[in-house]
Amino acid sequence: MAKADKATAVAEIAEKFKEATAAVVTEYRGLTVSNLAELRRSLGNSTTYTVAKNTLVKRAAVEAGVEGLDDMFAGPTAIAFINGEPVDAAKAIKKFAKDNKALIVKGGYMDGRALTVGEVERIADLESREVLLSKLAGAMKAKQSQAAALFVAPASQVARLAAALQEKKAAGDSAESAA
């Protein structure tokens, strides 16, 4: 690879690091071209799966200000640059790795820090952002109705108490008039 080509490749990878919301580093040894194509399809349009030389990726990471990934760049390495929802892409990678034992997740990068394999798997186990937001909205709505019931309860209890006292007084008055 010519020096100019290397510089271009480093710049492209650095740009992908800068634009991505997250990245997952994998080892693809043993996967066929058709396996890689299937993985790319499963990741969707918001994720770019890039195979590159480790030395170029290391330089690009330094250029992009990404730290803590150097240990992951050994052996045949490919990076999934995620521009959309990290949970969806992590789920797709985890599912593909389960079906294809040759794909090994080495770690990742999100929110300015390196992620371990366990952290990437925990992200994959999360529910999607939309599901979490709908659960939060449901919980907030339920809490509001509970709070409204709590504020209304004392007034209804006072009304029932007043009605009971009125009935008792009426029963007492009718007993006195009968005597």
UniProtKB/Swiss-Prot annotation:
Entry keywords, A to Z: Ribonucleoprotein, Ribosomal protein, RNA-binding, rRNA-binding
GO biological process: translation
Gene Ontology CC: one annotated term: large ribosomal subunit
SUPFAM superfamilies, sorted: Ribosomal protein L10-like
Pfam families: Ribosomal_L10 (PF00466)
Keyword rRNA-binding attributed: yes
One MF annotation (Gene Ontology) recorded for this entry: structural constituent of ribosome
Quaternary data: Part of the ribosomal stalk of the 50S ribosomal subunit. The N-terminus interacts with L11 and the large rRNA to form the base of the stalk. The C-terminus forms an elongated spine to which L12 dimers bind in a sequential fashion forming a multimeric L10(L12)X complex.
Family statement: Belongs to the universal ribosomal protein uL10 family.
HAMAP family per the UniProt record, alphabetical: Ribosomal_uL10
Function description: Forms part of the ribosomal stalk, playing a central role in the interaction of the ribosome with GTP-bound translation factors.
Protein's UniProt name: Large ribosomal subunit protein uL10
The organism of origin for this protein: Mycolicibacterium vanbaalenii (strain DSM 7251 / JCM 13017 / BCRC 16820 / KCTC 9966 / NRRL B-24157 / PYR-1) (Mycobacterium vanbaalenii)
Lineage: Bacteria, Bacillati, Actinomycetota, Actinomycetes, Mycobacteriales
